[in-house]
C-alpha cells in the first residue's frame, strides 16, 4: 500500500501469505475429498509455502534492524 514502511509491508506480506497458504491447503483437501487430481494444487502449495518462508525471513531481518517486535501492529 502507498505510504507503508518496509516493516509494515513485510508484516502485510507475512499476514497475507499465511492466508494464501491456508486457503491452498483447503483447496488441496477439497480436491482430494472430491476425488480430483491434486498434483498441480500441491505444487502451488509448495511454492506458496516457500514464498511464505522468504516473507518470514525478510520480516525477521527487518525486525533485527529496527529492534521492533515482528508481528505487532505498530
Q: Which residues make up each language-model segment?
A:
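Anionic, Ser/Thr-rich low-complexity intrinsically disordered regions
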Residues: 1-74
Amino acid at each position: 500500500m502507498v505510504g507503508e514502511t518496509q516493516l509494515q509491508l513485510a508484516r502485510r506480506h507475512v499476514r497475507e501469505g499465511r492466508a494464501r497458504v491456508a486457503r491452498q491447503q483447503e483447496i488441496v483437501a477439497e480436491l482430494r475429498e472430491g476425488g480430483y487430481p491434486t498434483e498441480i494444487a500441491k505444487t502451488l502449495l509448495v511454492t506458496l509455502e516457500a514464498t511464505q518462508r522468504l516473507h518470514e525471513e525478510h520480516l525477521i531481518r527487518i525486525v533485527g534492524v529496527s529492534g521492533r517486535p515482528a508481528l505487532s501492529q505498530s
